[in-house]
Amino acid sequence: MRKTDKKNQLPAEELLKRYKKRYRAVLIVLAAFVALTAFYVYLNYDYLAFKHFITGAYIYTDTLDEIYRKELGTDIKGKYYRNFDDMVISVVTKRISSEKGDKYTYLYTPSQLVKQNEEEKQEAAQSEIKVLNDRALYLRLTNFSRYTLDFMKDNAEKLKSRKNIIIDLRDNRGGDIDAMVDMSGMFLPKKTVVATDQFRWWEHVYRSGRNQPLKYDKIIILQNGNTASASENMIAALNDNLDNVDLIGSETFGKGIGQFTLPLKRGYAVKATILKWYTPNDINIQGNGIDPETPYTGGDILQFALDRL
């Protein structure tokens, strides 16, 4: 038995009303889109007009070629309009950097971004875990990234095999804050404050999401002047929240600011400083590193640390 199509049974006037409603809805959406586009063009008129004016009318194209080549590191082959935004971003970020001394704000060209990602992966591959004796483990972390996070997860059982651990963060210049929070959280009770990020208009508190899968009688952290950013954050997270942590080495770098890398079109990206971060004890370390509880600059720091367990 075939089902009847109730829609086709509606009177012609009712069908017409329905189609009119749909037509009006489409018109409203289209009108809103046109209005928003016009408003956007109005707000950005000066920039858009300048972009069209310079890329389409400026006669000294050899000057343009040189500027594009200098800023983007490649010959854009006369495609001034297409590459204009990336060139402007490069110029502006360099000016910001020179004015403020903020060396962490800049444009990535496609080749630079690929190189940076590959170097991050290669650096992470140098992380290692060693069993030192029947009481202690050695964990060296070379950066904070999805690679080192996976490294720790993959070796979770090995990390549980001893009652003491020496974490080597020397020359670790930091990395991704989300990876750092997850990695630090392995040593902390659930919902423990790891860090607070202060943005221009709001703040975000990071808390550990695990129930301390890695517990030790004693944790020793090795640090030096190249221990920076997310590494310093991990040191503060463990040292502020646990009573069994000993910091050995020299004062850390003192980087209490954070950056975000924003992907752009055609493989470009822009990195900019967008936050200050605070330790669980509400301290911003920018310009002032973390002092070790046990200063040490002699040889064989690993044996020195092992003797303190």
Where would I find each of the regions flagged by the language model?
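Low-complexity, Gly/Ser/Thr/Pro-rich intrinsically disordered linker/tail segments
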Residues: 293, 298-309
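Gly/Ser/Thr-rich loop/hinge elements
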Residues: 121-124, 173-222, 226-229, 257-262, ...
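A generic structural signal for alpha->beta connector loops
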Residues: 126, 191, 216, 242-244, ...
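Extracellular/periplasmic catalytic domains that process cell-envelope and extracellular macromolecules
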Residues: 121, 129-133, 158-161, 212-216, ...
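Flexible, low-complexity junctional segments that flank or bridge functional domains
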Residues: 2-165, 169-178, 182-185, 189-195, ...
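Soluble periplasmic/extracytoplasmic beta-strand elements of cell-envelope proteins
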Residues: 53, 93-95, 137-142, 164-170, ...
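Short, well-structured beta-strand/strand-turn elements
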Residues: 226, 241-255
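Non-catalytic, well-ordered alpha-helical segments in soluble enzyme domains
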Residues: 231, 235, 239-243
